[in-house]
Amino acid sequence: MGNRLGLTALLLIVLVTIGKAQTSYQKTDSISLALFNASEWQKLVTYGKNALNNGEDFPLLRLRIAYANFVRENYVEALTQYNKVLDHDKHNQIALYYAYLCNAYLNRDENAGYLASHLDSNVVEGEKIRSFKLTDVGAESGIKFTNIYERGNSTFSRAFIDMRLAYKLNLSASYSYYNQPIHNDNISQPGYYAKLNFTPFRRISFIGAYHYMRSTLRQLVYQNNAVLAGIKYAGNGSDIQGDFVQSQIGDEKTRQYDLKFVKYISGNLNFYSISRFSLVNVLQENNLVFQQLFGVKPMHNLWLEGVVTLGNQYNYAEADALYIYNGFDKTKFKAGANCYFLLKHHLLLGLSYTFERKSDNIFKFNYLQHSINGGITWNF
């Protein structure tokens, strides 16, 4: 008899608990839907977070919170919710589509491509999403000024093309030319660069790059090359990338180990930072190089960046080995500013200034170098 009474009491407790949970769910669902329909985005975000903290967690609530953040252009918070939905239902088309847009608006083209590969065909056709797509073409050119006779003004030019070969595979390729007067001679250096980005998972990408440079100095020809291999993890509000670069520059072998952090501080590209730590092993020395960049969007379609690089940058590879500092001298300090203006959605104009403190590689005298660079990119 006692066992029956105990079992009955337990069943009553379970039924009451379930009833309260259902009532709580119905209330949360009703209020969040009303806020959603009324376009009360900030109130919806606040209410939804409180509901989640109280254990009231269901896909529709997260989708509503995510969309409220998306409308407010907080793509990081929106992605946080969409990724939670996809963790439990990887085929949810609403979460896939808006997560695709969030990644695209954060310039994560490789992650956006992965998500596009899982969209229904009617969505792909309606949005005109293509697995093979030419994404960008452009060019940049600049000049470097020095304050000493022994080093003339050098020039740099580059033309590039970016494309998506498949939803999960991206290619960047470019041709560059660098020229630097050295006393009574010149360093002339054409270069070819290619980078593949493969994204087999929603958050993880593998990176491979190759850079070839042919340098001519005093009738000597050097076949220089650099190879990069890396992995990148795309978090909700930040990216982490680790990579390794091995290069043969002239007669010198260089090994470089990088760790890069990208933080979307404002939840979008209105305020962001990029921190990069590098260990460069060259000439039997280990040089630590640290680079810090902050970017801000002060007005519509305009971005400003400030960047500083500390450490001995001899044979230093930057931007996934796109830029190899194969100069005659060592760079000890570098700081600069970049400006980008988006004109009519497709045309991006860029202008940058760089200040460098350099040291002669043989006689050890110091000098300053100033650089001005301009670029143009057409986005398809």
Task: Give the positions of each predicted feature.
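Outer-membrane beta-barrel translocator/channel fold
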Residues: 176-191, 209-227, 242-259, 264-367, ...
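Generic helix N-cap/helix-start motif at coil->alpha-helix transitions
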Residues: 22-28, 56-62, 91-96, 152-153, ...
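Transmembrane beta-strand segments of Gram-negative outer membrane beta-barrel proteins
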Residues: 127-145, 164-173, 206
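Alpha-helical protein-protein interaction scaffolds
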Residues: 22-131
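Bacterial Sec-dependent N-terminal signal peptides
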Residues: 1-26
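Surface-exposed strand-loop-strand hairpins of Gram-negative outer-membrane beta-barrel proteins
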Residues: 143-160, 173-183
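Outer-membrane beta-barrel strand-turn architecture
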Residues: 106, 163-169, 198-204, 233-237, ...
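Short, charged beta->alpha transition segments
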Residues: 81, 125, 193-197, 226-232
